[in-house]
């Protein structure tokens, strides 16, 4: 649907008030606009009243029936914000809705993974059907077909909800209750129903605990989870979350956006303002978190004296102050229809409310939130590679819930880090093969958290003079989740909550790194700095680097270029993917497959097997810049001296990887180990030729940290060249991580003066790299390569972009210290010299 059309539907524009251009996009057809109104309203589960669909579709009941059918067919969450309509009007409870969904997918013999994540979690909560239970039910369903008396899927599903968690502050509403229903109720149940009908909605904590559960299981009541403007929400490590698939419907998208943005010091109204999302939608999402048990309220007053005696021994995360009249938390669309508490009006235009919150209650919540002395935090940015390591390694029994939280919520807040650190401490440092990689990342992550979190020495000069310095709290943020927000919203979220961003290194090439001027970012300044372009930039400014060839998408090789003759191993980087080392003997087919859908960087890596790499941490100490070049003092390498003069390494942190292609130290099988980077596949399954070949990863045994093996043999400066430069804190090596953290502290990188210099240097570096990249985009459409028989090429005709980083429009070669355009022959005489860096 057209974005402009959606905007005008969302803001209830009738056809007569639509701008001319919007009408033209609809073919000047009012009927088409009305169709779009109905479709948008159903997809977004909008209430019939007070929305444009009321003027388009006259039958309210039919509209809700269509909405329910669409939601069920698309496996969406039950529309709890429409519970008054769904339960009282259509007699569809959440239990019957999910039982119908489960019946549908069983009859279609779909896998459990077809259920979206949140829908699967709600099914598990109400039906008690998870992955294993579903497989068992499907086996029973299939086996029953072999016998005369066949059982349907419905026969195998539960007849009533499982025991669910109900909080005392939830509101009990009367459902669709007939006289026949009353007859089967016990005396206490009848009393509770009479109280709800006569006195209005009741806090569940004011009723008998067992009666509430009994009435809910019978479908006679439904539960609202009220969220007010001042509600503050905490998200603990996820329990009961089902990792299936992401569907992408409006509410699921909203849930993930709020997940990564929410914190327990920001109330719902402030959060809606930061995200620029309608307040009622944010309340619906937060209410869903609480209902599913993924979040709980903060800052509420517990008054046990007002609770029904049956609730006294019931464990509860939180309880609303029960002296608050639940009727005051409800809103009404008109004089006679009660509105769900989670649908409070979000603007002053909703004048049909029957009450406002008690000012005293609002004040008590506000004072609690203000008295916490909340300060901004440090954010440590990681990617999904880290969460994969924590989940796959089977490192600790309770570590997985934290890893799932880091992946699904996109954030692990400082309040959860104590329990996370306890689980990381349980990880043993012993492992073999690939498992060792998981152990190393877990242990190094723990050290990084301990270093950044509440480190008073780290930020000694950034604290306010009138406040004691305890350092800053730390949140862990997943880059991919932040990128789910639009750039402006992401910037507002980061500015509101954080004083400094620190990235892990290296971030996978498969994501676009977060760019930020404020708060300052110790990490890649712009996406191009974390791309293939930056490698070429480093080689260009230093005049040193391995033989490299960047081929544009669509290029086809007939033979391996001459600059790679004699190399036993090549480092291959497919655009938007992480690099891998492959044998030169059988690389041609894989290269051509990859080039059909991606630009590719080819680099010489090893003459005698895999080349040897050494990681040199920066910023450099004065002692590291003096003396003669040795393996233990690579900081005096000429290339690094030039690099320091062109790139400010004193206010950044990270490491430079040096490569010795002629070393025979690392001549061992590729399969024995793995690289510090994550994804193993270069040629993905989306390859147009259907190739399933993949590039194996750089072996980690070939990588060492500076001074790890200081006496492992003589080495010449000319043997070593820079391979790459990564900004951030590395997690793949504990020794390298320790050195980088130590340098951050000793050089005061997190102090105010250093961060100001960092901001200036980041902008300068960004401009230089962007100019460098831009110089290869001009004239791309007119470039004509005349390949000799050894090479043929089909170039991209425009400098298109992948994930925001421009693709190369020219084939480029780096050889003998010179970056030049490659025409398919021997090195071109046409050098790229007009670079003003």
Curated annotation (Swiss-Prot):
One of its GO terms (biological process) is vesicle tethering to Golgi. Keywords: Cytoplasmic vesicle, Golgi apparatus, Phosphoprotein. The keyword Phosphoprotein applies. InterPro entries: FAM91, FAM91_C_dom, FAM91_N_dom. Residues 670-680 have a biased composition (Basic and acidic residues). The modification Phosphoserine is found at residues 332, 340, 671, 828, 834. Residues 334-366, 670-691 are annotated as: Disordered. Its main location: Golgi. It is found in: Golgi apparatus, trans-Golgi network; Cytoplasmic vesicle. It comes from the Eukaryota. Residues 340-366 have a biased composition (Polar residues). The keyword Lyase does not apply. Transmembrane segments: none annotated. GO terms for cellular component: cytoplasmic vesicle; trans-Golgi network. Belongs to the FAM91 family. Component of the complex WDR11 composed of C17orf75, FAM91A1 and WDR11; FAM91A1 and WDR11 are required for proper location of the complex. Interacts with golgins GOLGA1 and GOLGA4 and with TBC1D23; interaction with golgins may be mediated by TBC1D23 and interaction with TBC1D23 recruits TBC1D23 to AP-1-derived vesicles. PANTHER family: PROTEIN FAM91A1. As component of the WDR11 complex acts together with TBC1D23 to facilitate the golgin-mediated capture of vesicles generated using AP-1. This is Protein FAM91A1. It comes from Mus musculus (Mouse). The lineage of its organism: Eukaryota, Metazoa, Chordata, Craniata, Vertebrata. The gene is Fam91a1.
């Amino acid at each position: 649907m057209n974005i402009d059309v959606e905007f005008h539907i969302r803001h209830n524009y009738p056809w007569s008030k639509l701008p001319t251009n919007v009408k033209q996009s609809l073919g000047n057809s009012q009927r088409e606009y009305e169709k779009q109104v109905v479709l948008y309203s159903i997809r977004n589960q909008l209430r019939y009243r007070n929305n444009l669909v009321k003027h388009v579709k006259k039958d309210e009941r039919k509209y809700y029936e269509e909405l329910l059918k669409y939601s069920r067919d698309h496996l969406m969450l039950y529309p709890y914000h429409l519970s008054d309509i769904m339960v009282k009007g259509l007699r569809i409870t959440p239990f019957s809705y999910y039982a119908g969904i489960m019946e549908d997918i069983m009859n279609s013999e779909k896998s459990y993974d077809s259920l979206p994540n949140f829908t699967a979690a709600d099914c598990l909560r109400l039906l008690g059907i998870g992955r294993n239970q579903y497989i068992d039910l499907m086996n029973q369903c299939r086996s029953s077909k072999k016998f005369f008396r066949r059982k349907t899927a419905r026969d195998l599903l539960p007849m009533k909800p499982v025991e669910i968690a109900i909080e005392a502050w939830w509101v009990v509403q009367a459902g669709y209750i007939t006289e026949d229903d009353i007859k089967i109720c016990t005396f206490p149940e009848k009393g509770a129903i009479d109280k709800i009908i006569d006195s209005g909605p009741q806090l569940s904590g004011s009723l008998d605990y067992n009666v509430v559960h009994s009435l809910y299981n019978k479908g006679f009541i439904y539960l609202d989870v009220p969220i007010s403007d001042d509600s503050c929400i905490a998200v603990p490590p996820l329990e009961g979350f089902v990792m299936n698939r992401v569907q992408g419907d409006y509410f699921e998208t909203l849930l993930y956006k709020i997940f990564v943005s929410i914190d327990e010091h920001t109330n719902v109204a402030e959060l809606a303002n930061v995200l620029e999302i309608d307040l009622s939608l944010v309340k619906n999402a937060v209410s869903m978190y609480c209902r599913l048990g993924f979040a709980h309220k903060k800052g509420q007053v517990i008054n046990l004296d007002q609770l029904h005696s049956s609730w006294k021994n019931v464990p509860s995360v939180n309880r609303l102050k029960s002296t608050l009249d639940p009727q005051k938390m409800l809103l009404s669309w008109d004089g006679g229809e009660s509105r769900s508490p989670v649908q409070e009006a979000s603007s002053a235009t909703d004048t049909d409310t029957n009450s406002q919150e008690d000012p005293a209650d609002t004040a008590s919540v506000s004072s609690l939130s203000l008295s916490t002395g909340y300060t901004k935090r440090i954010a440590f940015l990681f990617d999904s590679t880290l969460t994969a390591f924590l989940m796959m390694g089977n490192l600790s029994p309770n570590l997985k819930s934290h890893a799932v939280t880091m992946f699904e919520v996109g954030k692990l807040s400082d309040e959860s880090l104590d329990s996370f650190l306890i689980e990381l401490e349980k990880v043993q440092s012993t492992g073999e093969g690939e498992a060792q990689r998981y152990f190393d990342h877990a242990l190094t992550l723990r050290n990084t958290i301990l270093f950044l979190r509440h480190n008073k020495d780290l930020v000694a000069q950034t604290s306010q003079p009138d406040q004691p310095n305890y350092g800053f709290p730390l949140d862990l943020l997943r880059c991919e989740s932040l990128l789910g927000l639009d750039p402006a919203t992401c910037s507002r979220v980061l500015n509101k909550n954080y004083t400094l961003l620190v990235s892990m290194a290296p971030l996978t090439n498969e994501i676009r790194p977060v760019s930020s001027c404020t708060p300052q970012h110790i990490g890649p300044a712009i996406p191009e700095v974390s791309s293939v372009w930056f490698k070429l930039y480093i080689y260009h400014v230093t005049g040193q680097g391995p033989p490299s060839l960047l081929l544009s998408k669509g290029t086809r090789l007939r033979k391996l270029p001459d600059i790679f003759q004699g190399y036993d191993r090549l480092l291959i980087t497919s655009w938007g993917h992480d690099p891998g080392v492959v044998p030169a003997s059988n690389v041609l087919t894989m290269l051509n497959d990859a080039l059909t859908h991606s630009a590719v960087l080819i680099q010489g890596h090893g003459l005698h097997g895999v080349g040897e790499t050494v990681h040199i941490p920066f910023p450099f100490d004065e002692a590291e810049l003096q003396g003669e070049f040795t393996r233990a003092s690579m900081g005096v390498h000429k290339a690094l001296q030039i690099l320091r003069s062109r790139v400010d390494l004193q206010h950044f942190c990270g490491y430079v990887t040096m490569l010795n292609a002629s070393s025979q130290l690392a001549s061992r099988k590729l399969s024995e180990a793995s690289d510090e980077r994550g994804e193993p596949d270069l040629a993905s399954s989306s390859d147009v030729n259907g190739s399933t070949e993949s590039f194996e990863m750089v072996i980690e045994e070939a990588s060492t940290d500076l001074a790890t093996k200081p006496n492992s043999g003589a080495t010449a400066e000319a043997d070593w060249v820079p391979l790459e430069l990564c900004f951030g804190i590395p997690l793949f090596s504990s020794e390298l991580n320790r050195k980088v953290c130590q340098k951050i502290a000793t050089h005061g990188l997190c102090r105010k003066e250093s961060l100001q210099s960092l901001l200036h240097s980041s902008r300068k570096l960004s401009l230089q790299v962007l100019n460098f990249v831009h110089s290869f985009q001009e004239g791309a459409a007119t470039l004509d390569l005349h390949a000799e028989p050894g090479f043929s090429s089909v170039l991209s005709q425009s400098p298109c972009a992948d994930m925001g980083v421009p693709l190369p429009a020219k084939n480029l070669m780096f050889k003998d210290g010179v970056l030049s355009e490659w025409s398919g022959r021997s090195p071109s005489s046409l050098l790229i010299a007009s670079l003003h860096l």
